Swiss-Prot record:
Pfam families registered for this protein in UniProt: EMC1_C (PF07774)
Entry comment on modification after translation: N-glycosylated.
Residues on Lumenal side: 25-723
Lineage: Eukaryota, Fungi, Dikarya, Ascomycota, Saccharomycotina
Glycan-carrying positions: 73, 106, 192, 202, 420, 443, 574, 578
Signal peptide: 1-24
Record keywords, A-Z: Endoplasmic reticulum, Glycoprotein, Membrane, Signal, Transmembrane, Transmembrane helix
Assembly mode: Component of the ER membrane protein complex (EMC), which is composed of EMC1, EMC2, EMC3, EMC4, EMC5 and EMC6.
Record-stated family: Belongs to the EMC1 family.
Protein name (database record): ER membrane protein complex subunit 1
The encoding gene: EMC1
Originating species: Saccharomyces cerevisiae (strain ATCC 204508 / S288c) (Baker's yeast)
Length: 760
């Protein structure tokens, strides 16, 4: 077809309309989708700062092995800084020679540290021979300054001892935590043990200024509750009503009348103005993301269980806002599980041998039942055996086990020992620092089948079972179109053993059914056991981290990839080759593997694997660093088959997502998901990943002393447009294009007719 000048003009007009009417702006979500709840823990001691009356030093022991020291502004309720000490403080006193210096002592180890009271700089430390100190007073104020009478708190005048300020005590008042009357006056009350309220003077009145609740410290378990759009529920009801109709005509008439009523309601809401209706349909408020949060699965409630026996719901799209909180009145929380598919009920196990069933509602959950286990022992751990049969394996601190079955029906929340023995076998693997143990549950009895114990000079430092994922591909397609088949045997676990005598780290891959070790790999580069070690097990690969001293001190990352065979197109698990997986009879092929070691510039504390709905998105290794930051690395960078760029063959470069081997992996600033936040994860923190309705997006949360959540997109946000995308201009552009097409269509038809008759 011949192109004329007129056609070119039309093309330029279309391009102009496209560029002028459509503007897609993609903005950074930093500090918009992520949030942090910083905690101090229950206040053990409050120490005034002599150089600033508005500042105090707060000591708390959130864990059994560490102490948290925080500088706090009592006038504004703002946290100024926090510092975790690697030991608990038994004594804290002022230096006799310098009252601006604080001496912290651990009596069991005689370890002491001397800090500047104002900015908490470490001045001196040692073992034994601590500096001479002055004992701190038990209270932060004099007893004759405050009195409590008839449910009122009176602040007394220093000379007349008459009440200068009066305050009605809040419900649940426990004690006066801190008080000073110098300008400005500051008063802190402790309420319900975990709540702290700050007051200041406004004339003759005491007014509340700030409030904190420290119940969230030390999260031990979590559950996620999806929030659904009420309109989806209404739509489901309409569809069910249509399906229940007697005939096709009745179903059609029901849909027609329902949609007509919706149209009338829409017109009423907009005062029967077509212009308002059209504007509402085109408008898209970039700040209002309620609908998109519901649609894309961002709207979730994070339910957390704390060590001190509190359970609470946090709104994940509203910066972790507390929706509800419930005191379970137990000594310690251990584990909790959903008891039904609809997520209407939770069961919580406590450390003292009780279990509670909790009905979860939107407003305030209620405790339905509270019962002791059949064996009144201290609970160490709880494992869910079967999601549908509500069976749990409870391990006590004396190593005994209890098989527990819960009937989630109404008024029957009691433990039941099944009378009908199941013919199926359930295999369970447990581990501790002394070894790994295999059990079989048969006929409602628990029997140990195998045991892998370590010797006295060894310790198991990390353990991970193979992650259950959606299987998308059986193998890796190479550059020459051949396939390396993944080793997808599900009953696998990987663990690390530290040998203090020989200064080695040993990686083992074990079959959890038989206890057979399939792969072992030893590292003799002088691992430093003072630093943390961790391991994660993905679909067909394992990644573990440790710190070594040779040849130079550095953090190591090791990846191990498992294949059925390292020979392309060789698949040993094909049923046509008369091969079957049966580990109990010894019919199992050991995996062949490739491994690579990388250097990482920061010390890694814990690791986790990103999860998405269908597991299509590239997996990311999410890492919590020792410095309090959280970052992630796409798994494709940790390639065990990678070679240096100069050694890569031509076919290897054609492989999808192939990356050359680089021994040092730098930290990408764009992948630091905590940004400049001061995050205190704690010694037993959990790094978790929660899938959303968007395949590209995963929610990452760190649960410990603090709670932090954000979203990551390891493969980019390929399935979501920005809220600022200008939908109205796009529709106008399409409309203008249709109009132009309508008017130029006769001209094009006329040209075609003339060309057939050879008319110029």
């Amino acid at each position: 077809m011949k192109i004329t000048c007129t056609d070119l003009v039309y093309v330029f007009i279309l391009l102009f309309l496209n560029t002028s009417c459509v503007q897609a702006v993609f903005s950074d979500d930093a500090f918009i989708t992520d949030w942090q709840l910083a905690n101090l823990g229950p206040w053990e001691k409050v120490i005034p700062d002599s150089r600033d009356r508005n500042r105090v030093l707060i000591l708390s022991n959130p864990t059994e092995t560490s102490c948290l020291v925080s500088s706090f502004n009592v006038s504004s309720g703002q946290i100024l800084f926090r510092n975790v000490l690697p030991f608990t403080i038994d004594e804290i006193q002022l230096d006799s020679n310098d009252h601006n210096a604080m001496v912290c002592v651990n009596s069991s180890s005689n370890h002491w540290q001397k800090y500047d009271l104002h900015d908490w700089f470490l001045l001196e430390e040692g073992v034994d021979n601590a500096p001479s100190t002055t004992i701190l007073p038990q209270s932060s104020y004099l007893n004759d300054q405050v009195s409590i009478k008839n449910n009122e708190l009176h602040i007394l005048d220093e000379q007349s001892k008459l009440a200068e300020w009066k305050l009605e005590l809040p419900q649940g008042f426990n004690k006066v935590e801190y008080f000073h009357r110098e300008d400005p006056l500051a008063l802190v009350l402790n309420v319900n043990d975990t709540q702290y309220m700050g007051f200041s003077a406004n004339g003759t009145e005491l007014i509340p200024v700030w409030q904190r609740d420290e119940w969230l410290t030390n999260v031990v378990d979590y559950a996620v509750l999806d929030v659904f759009d009420s309109r989806d529920v209404e739509l489901n009801k309409d569809m069910k009503a249509e399906l229940d109709s007697n005939s096709l005509w009745n179903a059609y008439w029901l849909r027609l009348t329902t949609n007509w009523n919706r149209l009338i309601n829409l017109l009423k809401e907009n005062q029967f103005s077509p212009g308002r209706v059209f504007t509402k349909l085109l408008a898209l408020d970039a700040k209002d993301t309620t609908v998109s949060d519901l649609k894309f699965g961002f709207a979730k409630i994070l339910i957390v269980l704390t060590h001190d026996g509190f359970i609470g719901g946090l709104d994940m799209v509203n910066k972790g806002q507390l929706i509800w909180k419930l005191d379970l009145e137990i000594d310690q929380g251990v584990k909790m599980f959903w008891t039904d598919k609809n997520h209407d009920e939770l069961v919580v196990f406590s450390h003292d041998g009780h279990y509670l069933t909790i009905e979860v509602t939107k407003d305030q959950p209620i405790i339905k039942s509270r019962s002791p286990l059949s064996e009144r022992k201290t609970v160490d751990s709880v494992i869910r055996l079967n999601e549908h049969d509500h069976q749990y394996l409870i391990k006590f601190e004396d190593k005994d086990h209890l098989l527990f079955k819960l009937n989630p029906g109404k008024n029957t929340d009691v433990p039941i020992v099944a009378n009908n023995h199941s013919s199926s076998h359930i295999f369970v693997t447990e581990h501790d620092t002394n070894g790994i143990y295999g059990y079989i549950i048969e006929n409602d009895t628990v029997k140990q089948t195998w045991k892998k114990a370590v010797n006295s000079k060894e310790k198991m430092v990390a353990y991970s079972k193979r992650e259950t994922t959606n299987l998308n591909t059986l193998g890796i397609t190479l550059g020459d179109k051949s396939v390396l088949y993944k080793y997808l045997y599900p009953n696998l676990a990987a663990y690390l053993i530290a040998n203090e005598e020989h200064h080695t780290i040993t990686f083992n891959l074990i079959d959890t059914i038989t206890g057979e070790i399939l792969i072992t790999q030893e590292h003799k580069d002088s691992p430093d056991f003072r630093f943390p070690m961790d391991i994660v097990f993905g679909e067909y690969w394992v990644v573990y981290s440790y710190f070594s001293s040779e040849p130079v001190p550095e953090q190591k990352l090791v990846v191990v990839e498992l294949y059925e065979s390292l020979t392309p197109d060789e698949r040993l698990s094909n049923s046509s080759d008369n091969f079957s997986y049966d580990p109990l009879t010894g019919h199992i092929n050991k995996p062949q593997f490739q491994t690579k070691q990388f250097i990482f510039p920061e010390i890694i504390k814990t690791m986790s694997i990103s999860k998405t709905t269908d597991d299509i998105t590239t997996k990311a290794i999410v890492m919590e660093l020792e410095n309090g930051q959280i970052t992630y690395i796409p798994k494709l960078l940790l390639n065990a088959r990678g070679k240096p760029a100069e050694e890569m063959a031509k076919d290897k470069k054609k492989e999808f997502m192939a990356t050359p081997y680089t021994p040092v992996i730098p930290i990408n600033d764009n992948f630091i998901i905590t940004h400049f936040r001061n995050l205190l994860p704690g010694s037993d923190s959990q790094l978790i990943s929660i899938p959303t309705n968007l395949e590209s997006t995963s929610i990452i949360c760190d649960l410990g002393l603090d709670v932090f959540c954000t979203r990551i997109t390891p493969s980019g946000q390929f399935d979501l447009m920005s809220p600022t995308f200008e939908k109205g201009k796009l529709l106008i552009t399409i409309f203008v294009l249709l109009v132009i097409t309508y008017f130029i269509r006769p001209s094009v038809s006329n040209k075609k007719l003339k060309s057939q008759w050879l008319i110029k």
